[in-house]
Regions:
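Bacterial N-terminal signal peptides
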Residues: 10-22
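Signal peptide processing junction and immediate N-terminal pro/mature segment
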Residues: 20-35
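Alpha-helical scaffolds flanking conserved acidic
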Residues: 186-187, 225-226, 446-447, 647-651
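Surface-exposed interaction patches
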Residues: 186, 211-212, 236-237, 568, ...
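Active-site substrate-binding loop specific to GH73 endo-beta-N-acetylglucosaminidase modules
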Residues: 147-158, 162, 168-172, 204-219, ...
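Flexible, low-complexity segments enriched for small/polar residues
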Residues: 31-42, 46-50, 55-69, 96, ...
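N-terminal secretory signal peptides that target proteins for export/translocation
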Residues: 1-8
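N-terminal accessory alpha/beta regions
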Residues: 67-190, 194, 199-210, 215-219, ...
Length: 664
């Protein structure tokens, strides 16, 4: 090797010791309002070596090391680094903030995004209507193609519509690549998969930016009940699982009718009415526009009562009925788990309690409680009685019950242990994490701390025990070469090409957390080809010229280059087979897998897969799910024409496709 490991790291260590001293000299949490810095020292020996522990935390609590990160963790200490990551508000993250600020749409209010989306859709509908009146029966796709070719203003408008989803996908990956708050980004990815919403369902592509920005990110390391409530009231989830349309069964009285009847009974029949104060108490979140409020204020109390009763009757006529979708997924996927001890009767009772939890799909698209849709009768959920006559508080009571249930503690603890430790985490660790959940009333930060400071986390069996998801693979590859964040959609599209489009899982269970789901022949081949694409500079911002070792290794021998790449990309450890592949420049597995890929699937269009470009024609295909239900990636060349790499670029490309890099 050109440099020994000590020489390789010494300059960075010298600088970072001073930086770490500055970190420890920061004002106290009380002075700055930051989260406490809790350093947990090991209470028993750790099986992993010191070097392995550094790699473990960088690859599990983050998306892999950037150049210099290994030295930083060594200088700071593994336990101190963990403590700092668990207090992300103490970490300066200006680079990530600047990247996020460069996107056009992710900071825009949902109402503005809806208006933006509607303008383009309205123009298309108007042209369709004009065509229909003239007898033209061309399809919407033909019309869209004509508009895009002939109307620059509308073309730009439709591009903005596509960008709404593309921006939030790209920004999520860019943050994972550049952010210093790595654990926070890992937890955002975890919860957005746990509380999965599908961008391909209608207006959800417009609701997802706020879901990411206002619901998940502020609560990723916070309180589980708070996070659960924010998700339950988010337009993205309300729309995705049809909760916004769920209303009391026609056989059940609604809250508006019941309260209206009680208000009327207090007056003589000819003078029964409703004051504005009573209306506000009846529906405190009604989101009345100024015009609507003025109109109601101008009415007599009797007229106002009549409007409320008419609205309640209209709600009953809407025939929306009780929808169990969200209630079922709330219990099965979000809290208790499939074995959580609930019954179909519990699902129905939860759905009844949540009737009236809806939103205005247009305008502000904010959560609103509609009393005319709410089932007013008594409910019994998991043995807990929710008295009749309640309103929005019925749903809050349900969230309280399930968030604090022991089955939820175990389910969340197990899922976090799978994410951080192994696909089959030790039962004792899961139990300790579940107890932390219960003792802290769902403190996510405390549960994660229990897991990532445990002996099981630092066991030999946990080291490189996890297979990277497509998102983790792309982010870690870009971090390894010190790539600049890609603010186009191309890199985010690559995540979809590898099998897991960002916000692209249609079913509510989210992408799999276990490695077997990502390791079939097509997936492995695509991962190998992705490594070649990265080394060839096929992604904006991701070129080897950014890698700090590139310049001085150009003139090194092949063996020296291989040793340096193994140190930088694998933490210094590789199998003899991998080392031989890096030395000779040939991957026999790639050739074998290429021969097994069907010829008719040898082309795929990266430009439209798993992105906001849902209206573009799709070339190639995505394989049907495997027999076990696991996703299969698209197969083919999504990286342009094949390229033959040489020298150091070849070593790097092969390293990214190697098993050691595919695991974390």
């Amino acid at each position: 090797m050109i440099r020994t490991r000590t020489n390789f790291l010494r300059p960075a260590v010298t600088l970072l010791v001073a930086a770490c001293a500055a970190i420890t000299a920061r004002p106290t949490p009380a002075e700055r309002g930051h989260s406490p810095l809790i350093v947990v020292s090991p209470t028993e020996p750790r099986e992993q070596t010191a070097d392995q522990q550094v790699q473990q935390v960088l690859n599990r609590l983050g998306f892999g090391p950037r150049p210099g990160d290994v030295a930083k963790v060594r200088a700071l200490g593994v336990d101190q680094w963990i403590a700092l990551q668990l207090a992300p508000d103490r970490i300066e993250d200006g680079a990530a903030e600047r990247v996020v600020a460069s996107y056009e749409t992710i900071a825009k209010p949902t109402a503005e995004l809806i208006a933006m989306y509607d303008r383009g859709q309205l123009a298309i509908r108007q042209r369709q209507k004009a065509r229909a009146q003239s007898g033209d029966t061309s399809s919407k796709m033909d019309l869209r193609a004509e508009v895009l070719q002939g109307d620059p203003a509308l073309r730009e408008q439709l591009r903005q519509n596509q960008r709404i989803l593309g921006d939030v996908q790209s920004a999520k990956l860019a943050r994972a690549v550049v952010s210093e708050r790595q654990l926070d980004e890992v937890m955002v990815d975890f919860w957005e998969n746990h509380f999965n919403v599908f961008a391909g369902k209608g207006l959800d592509r417009i609701f997802i930016p706020a879901f990411d920005r206002d619901v998940i990110r502020p609560n990723a390391l916070g309180n589980f009940r708070t996070l659960l409530g924010a998700v339950a009231k988010s337009p993205a989830m309300l729309f995705y699982l049809d909760q916004w349309q769920s209303a009391a069964d026609s056989t059940q009285p609604t809250l508006a009718v019941a309260r209206g009847a009680r208000a009327g009974a207090r007056r003589a029949a000819p003078t029964a009415g409703m004051t504005m104060e009573e209306l506000d108490r009846l529906a405190p979140n009604a989101q009345l526009t100024p015009t609507q409020r003025k109109r109601l204020e101008a009415m007599t109390s009797e007229q106002r009562m009549q409007v409320v009763q008419q609205r309640a009757q209209a709600g009953a006529r809407a025939k929306r009925g009780l929808n169990e979708n969200y209630a079922r997924e709330l219990m099965e996927l979000h809290t208790l788990g499939v074995d959580g001890g609930y019954t179909q009767r519990d699902i129905i009772e939860v759905a009844r309690a949540l009737t009236g939890w809806t939103m205005n799909p247009r305008g502000t698209a904010e959560f609103v409680f509609r009393p005319e849709m709410h089932d007013v009768a008594q409910k019994v959920v998991l043995g807990h009685v929710i008295a009749g006559g309640g309103g929005v508080e019925d749903g809050e009571a349900v969230l309280d019950i399930v968030a604090r249930h022991p089955a939820t503690a175990h389910f969340i603890a197990h899922k976090l242990a799978v994410r951080f430790v192994s696909d089959t985490p030790p039962a004792a660790l899961v139990e300790r994490a579940a107890q932390t959940f219960l003792k802290t009333d769902g403190d996510i930060r405390a549960v994660v701390r229990t897991i990532v400071t445990s002996a099981e986390f630092f066991s030999r069996s946990a080291y490189r025990a996890k297979v990277k998801s497509p998102f983790e693979l792309v982010a870690s590859a870009f971090r390894a070469i010190d790539a600049q964040p890609d603010t186009t959609m191309r890199s985010a599209q690559m995540v979809g090409f590898l099998g897991a489009p960002i916000f692209g899982h249609q079913a509510p269970n989210g992408w799999p957390e276990t490695g077997e789901s990502w390791m079939n022949s097509g997936a492995i081949l695509n991962r190998i080809n992705f490594g070649v694409g990265v080394a060839a500079g096929r992604f904006p911002g991701a070129t080897l010229s950014h890698w700090s070792e590139m310049e001085h290794l150009k003139a090194a021998t092949r063996e020296q280059q291989v040793d340096a790449v193994i140190l930088a990309f694998f933490g210094g450890q590789s199998s003899p087979d991998t080392r031989e592949i890096l030395l000779n420049g040939e991957n026999p597995l790639a050739a074998k897998l290429s021969a097994s890929v069907p010829a008719d699937s040898a082309s795929a269009d990266l430009g439209v897969m798993g992105t906001g470009a849902d209206n573009a024609p799709t070339r190639g295909r995505v394989l049907a799910p495997a027999k076990n239900g696991a996703p299969r990636p698209a197969v083919g060349r999504a990286l342009g024409q094949p390229v033959q790499l040489n020298g150091l670029a070849q070593v790097v490309g092969l390293a990214i496709g190697a098993p050691e890099f595919q695991r974390r």
